């Protein structure tokens, strides 16, 4: 399941766990870049979302699963697992993927506690797999402009910042 250096010319095969809004952003990339990324499986509790992804990528029933615990008993062969579950559900599927030898691309936060984060890191090191964390907004023009303003001190020397978002 590990990617070898001589495999660089083929697409990276992935299974996505959690097929909500964030996952669909990554899947847009996979759809327009099939030479780089190939979706080979979807794990999603919600039937409608799971079926929508399956239809969009031509996945059959053997490539779809309603829960990750069942999936990891007989996983679809792939290079990596993309974990896009809700924030409080990152640890267990990450550990299961690592134990099975998959590389993991994980939405932030890595886990809910420092101990869980350390456990993921240790398990990945022991198994020889890569765990990468998505920080995609750091390259969004909005945030790049903020970084530029801070770096140039155009607005003065920044001493403190606070942010709040309406989740509605």
Regions found by a protein language model. Give the residues of each.
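Single conserved hydrophobic/aromatic residue that forms the stacking wall/gate
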Residues: 160-168
């Amino acid at each position: 399941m590990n990617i070898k250096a001589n495999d660089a010319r083929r697409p990276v095969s992935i299974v996505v766990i959690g097929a909500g809004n964030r996952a669909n952003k990554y899947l847009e990339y996979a759809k327009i870049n099939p030479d780089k990324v190939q979706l080979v499986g979807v794990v999603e509790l919600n039937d409608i979302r799971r079926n929508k992804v399956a239809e969009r990528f031509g996945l059959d029933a053997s490539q779809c699963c309603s829960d990750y615990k069942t999936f990891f008993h007989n996983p679809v062969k792939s290079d990596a697992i993309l974990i896009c579950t809700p924030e409080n559900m990152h640890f267990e599927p990450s550990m299961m993927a690592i134990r099975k030898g998959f590389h993991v691309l994980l939405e932030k936060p890595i886990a809910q506690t420092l101990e869980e984060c350390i456990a993921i890191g240790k398990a990945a090191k022991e198994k020889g797999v890569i765990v990468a964390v998505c920080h995609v907004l750091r390259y969004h023009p909005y945030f790049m402009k903020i970084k530029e303003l801070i770096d140039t001190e155009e607005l003065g020397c920044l001493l403190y910042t606070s942010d709040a978002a309406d989740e509605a």
